[in-house]
Design a protein with these regions (language model features):
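Charged, low-complexity intrinsically disordered regions
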Residues: 20-225
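Short, compositionally biased low-complexity segments
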Residues: 1-2, 185
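Terminal, regulation- and interaction-focused segments at domain boundaries
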Residues: 2-18, 25, 196-198
Length: 225
């Protein structure tokens, strides 16, 4: 019967069902509450914000809870990115948000992959006009395992603060464990993004583990900056 169903159902629906099962299973195992679909017309407090927030995005598999002393939210978000002179491009993100304790005054920071599309970065810089690539290396040489994969973007006036926060040793560890995850710090929250089409419980567990580690690091470092 399952083989017959897989022949009949569209691949996109099969992926959606598998992703839903993975997220619900993960949520149950760690103690998150699963709400499913969230409309943009709902209370703004329920929305996961960050750089992917738009007037056209669609959210599903929304989960919330408190884990390891952090308020955590999870959502699968899809959107079509438009930019003048470029072909529209569909994006789908798995987003995990952590409410930070000591980072209310930190600048907007994005750790982006070099492999992001041109339209993604064009849209990002149009939306956040103060973001620029930080010139790393003031306090030491960054490991190539990090710089070959990531660049850090922030407001130019805050680049030294960002280098102290994301220093050479910390970014080396990040490069070893984060794979293709990207990172944003904005308005007192930490966001981890994955663009894996197929969501697995292992991916979700890795995002949670890495997110808690990074949130603790940011909170500890923010106190002395």
């Amino acid at each position: 019967m399952k083989r017959f169903a897989s022949r009949v159902l569209p691949k996109s629906l099969l992926v959606h069902r598998a992703n839903k099962h993975a997220i619900m299973s993960f949520a149950e195992s760690v103690g998150l509450v699963y709400f499913g679909h969230v409309s943009q017309r709902d209370d703004d407090d329920q929305l996961i914000r960050g750089l992917t927030l738009s007037t056209s995005h669609r959210d599903r598999h929304y989960c919330v809870g408190s884990l390891y002393n952090y308020d955590v939210a999870l959502v699968e978000r899809s959107d079509t990115i438009h930019y003048p002179g470029k072909q529209p491009r569909d994006h789908q993100w798995l987003i995990m948000q952590f409410d930070l304790h000591n980072a209310k005054d930190l600048p907007h920071i994005f750790l982006g992959l070099h492999t992001h599309s041109d339209i993604f970065y064009a849209n990002l810089f149009a939306k956040f006009t103060t973001l620029q690539r930080a010139p790393l290396g003031t306090f030491g040489m960054y490991d190539r395992s990090f710089t070959d994969r990531y660049a850090i973007y922030t407001t130019p006036a805050e680049s030294l603060t960002v280098e102290r926060l994301f220093d050479t040793e910390m970014t080396k560890v990040l490069a070893q464990h984060f794979g293709t995850l990207t990172v944003e710090v904005s308005d007192g929250c930490l966001y981890l993004y994955s663009e894996h089409t197929r969501i697995t419980k292992g991916l979700l567990e890795a995002m949670l583990q890495n997110g808690i580690w990074l949130a603790k690091h940011i909170d500890e470092r923010a106190v002395v900056l």
